[in-house]
Curated annotation (Swiss-Prot):
Keyword Coiled coil: no
SUPFAM superfamilies listed in its UniProt record: Ribosomal protein S5 domain 2-like (SSF54211)
Gene that this sequence comes from: rpsI
GO cellular component labels: cytosolic small ribosomal subunit
Family: Belongs to the universal ribosomal protein uS9 family.
Keywords: Ribonucleoprotein, Ribosomal protein
An annotated GO BP: translation
Residue stretches of biased makeup (Basic residues): 111-130
Name of this protein: Small ribosomal subunit protein uS9
UniProt-recorded Gene Ontology molecular function terms: RNA binding; structural constituent of ribosome
Length: 130
């Protein structure tokens, strides 16, 4: 018998995470690696757990993630967004808790492009008065 799975897609900066929630004992696997090996920073692991803590479902679901693009912070944010969206499929009554914690909002902040004549997005070349 096929077991039920819940899907959610999360995005942050240039990262995209495809998240699957499967009823289980709380294992988190990212790109076929244990999440503690994949994300070396404890603070970012807390970010990933936020939706599960907000809905008091930590330890009820195994989280299986495919994520690509960006760095550690962007990927952690994308996973958080995907987990929150997948939890809505589990039970729509989680929406108020997730929304009040701000976990359903796609963070729109992106890297600003470099402009010609400047060294970066806003950094100008050194100015010499004389």
């Amino acid at each position: 018998m096929a077991q039920v799975q819940y899907y959610g897609t999360g995005r942050r900066k240039s990262s995209v995470a495809r998240v699957r929630l499967v009823p289980g004992d709380g294992k988190i696997v990212i790109n076929n690696r244990d999440w503690e090996d994949y994300i070396p920073f404890a603070a970012l692991r807390e970010v990933i757990k936020q939706p599960l803590v907000a809905t008091e479902t930590l330890g009820n679901y195994d989280v299986l993630v495919n994520v690509h693009g960006g760095g550690y912070t962007g990927q952690a944010g994308a996973i958080r967004h995907g987990v929150a969206r997948a939890l809505l499929q589990v039970a729509p009554e989680y929406r108020p808790a997730l929304k009040s914690a701000g976990l359903l909002t796609r963070d729109p902040r992106m890297k600003e492009r470099k402009k010609y004549g400047l060294k970066g997005a806003r950094r100008a070349p050194q100015f010499s008065k004389r």
